[in-house]
Amino acid sequence: MDQLKKPHILLCNDDGIEGEGLHALAASMKKIGNITVVAPAEPHSGMSHAMTLGTPLRIKKYYKNNRFFGYTVSGTPVDCVKVALSQILPSKPDLLVSGINYGSNTATNTLYSGTVAAALEGAIQGITSLAFSLATYENADFSYAAKFARKLSKKVLTEGLPPDTILSVNIPNIPESEIQGILVTEQGRSRWEEDAIERHDVYGNPYYWLNGTLMLLDTSLQHDEYAVRKHYVAVTPISCDFTNRDFMGSLEQWNLKK
């Protein structure tokens, strides 16, 4: 990237164009580059890497306080990245930043996350990409998260990332003075103990709300969720490649036949 030119930064999320974290991120990232915001028209949390097939997508301009803010896409976070690259941007951006998500995306939740998926789609398309998430579902304060997103983005623009790799960053929802430090972490293991809540409509037909408790299986500071719970910022390199190479040798010994 030309050091004399401001970087072009694509911003997206999964909480939708009105997401508070997206607006905090945009205000922060404007200080280091030229931004384009492309986000879902509606919240799409938990969509993972879903994309829309068989249904047309629509792009609309979005205004905040009568000023142009960005574009909405009537689809998923991954749709937003694909549409941004093919229909909105004249060329690939220097950086893609997804977030700031309302709620952490650590451990197994990484697989469910539309925020992380948008960044992974960027990496698949050859764009240096980051995902940021704030570990709370209430009383969110995005000020430090937005500040750290800007700081890390500047570093990544200088240093770069390996191919097909993103950084997924999870930040505690506490004042900056209480942050214990920054840790490079692994994706931890966790499991949801599901508890679907049954309700009935006015006709007596049952419907269900998915609910559950996240059970943490890794409890050391080298793992993302535990680190965040101990008031550290967790920076986790995530790869697009899901291959379990440690098991390949054992699998080959099965001598599978056609």
Swiss-Prot record:
Subcellular location: Cytoplasm
Organism, as annotated: Chlorobium phaeobacteroides (strain DSM 266 / SMG 266 / 2430)
Pfam families for this protein: SurE (PF01975)
Primary site of residence: cytoplasm
Cofactor dependence: a divalent metal cation
InterPro entries, per database record: SurE, SurE-like_Pase/nucleotidase, SurE-like_sf
Family membership noted in the UniProt record: Belongs to the SurE nucleotidase family.
Binding-site residues, a divalent metal cation: D14, D15, S45, N101
Protein name: 5'-nucleotidase SurE
Catalytic activity: a ribonucleoside 5'-phosphate + H2O = a ribonucleoside + phosphate
GO molecular function: 3'-nucleotidase activity; 5'-nucleotidase activity; exopolyphosphatase activity; metal ion binding; nucleotide binding
tRNA-binding is among the record's keywords: no
Highest classification ranks of the organism: Bacteria, Pseudomonadati, Chlorobiota, Chlorobiia, Chlorobiales
Bilayer-crossing regions: none
Function: Nucleotidase that shows phosphatase activity on nucleoside 5'-monophosphates.
GO CC list: cytoplasm
Cofactor, free-text remark: Binds 1 divalent metal cation per subunit.
HAMAP family hit by this protein: SurE
The enzyme's E.C. designation: 3.1.3.5
Keyword Metal-binding applies: yes
